[in-house]
Amino acid sequence: MANQKKHRWLPYLMVLPAFSIMVLVVVFPIVNTVARSFRTTDGRFTLDNYVYFFTSAEALQSLLFTLAEALTVMALSVVLSFLLALYLRFSKSPVSRALGKLYLLPRFIPGIAAVYAVMNVIKDSGSINRIAAAFGVDYKPGLLYDLKGIILSNLWFCIPFAAMMMSAALSSVNDSYVESARDAGCSWRDVLCRIILPLTYKDVIVSATFILMGQVGAFTIPYLTGPNNPKMLGILLYQRAPT
């Protein structure tokens, strides 16, 4: 009986360190921040912060701008990453093998260095402009300090992350399922909709959720590549937060 009780508590003891760290690093800051949002500087209860946020034109504009950016990045990242993962999983070409080794490379490049590299490509005097000038075309992309610049910069980070998760999910799809469906006369569209998506949709949702959460709270990329107005929500909160 004593051994049974010991084994029953063993799994909980094993996850306790990780759970404690999560509570300390994630849960406590969130609860503390929410609690402080209902207080004034002298500790009294107030709803003024929420009244200001939902009645301020600047705050609402920032919220809508952030949601537009986050949803766009999420949608593009999920679609492009899923297509990339499908290609890496089912193609046997040398190109797919090379991409399978290289697509995670952006994850190992320091974030600031990657952002400045993207900026040097998309700015009006950057690589795109110089390539166009070589063909006698004065082309200014107009991507930097704009919503499009934020989206392009974030895709650099989000696509490898989502593709990694989706590739792991697709690796669990047995080749025999696909081959049997093809032998039965199913098109690739039927295979995708009836076999692959039902087996991988949970990982797709998890990837989309992580990307959306990261974009809503993004700071570095919008700070360096975004417009002065409207601002991403993280930039606005940083500028309005008391020091």
Regions found by a protein language model. Give the residues of each.
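Interhelical loop and adjacent transmembrane-helix boundary motif
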Residues: 5-7, 50-58, 223-243
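Transmembrane helix boundary and interhelical loop/hinge segments in multi-pass membrane proteins
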Residues: 43-46, 125, 169-179, 188, ...
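Conserved short cytoplasmic inter-helical helices of the MFS fold
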Residues: 58, 95, 176-177, 188, ...
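Glycine/proline-centered hinge or cleavage motifs at structural transition points of membrane proteins
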Residues: 184-185, 198
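Membrane-water interface segments at the C-terminal ends of transmembrane alpha-helices
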Residues: 10-41, 57-140, 145-171, 199, ...
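Membrane-embedded glycan transfer/ligation machinery
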Residues: 47-48, 61, 73, 190, ...
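Short amphipathic alpha-helical coupling elements at transmembrane boundaries
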Residues: 39, 48-55, 97-100, 104, ...
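Short, Lys/Arg-rich N-terminal segment immediately upstream of the first membrane anchor
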Residues: 1-9, 13, 194
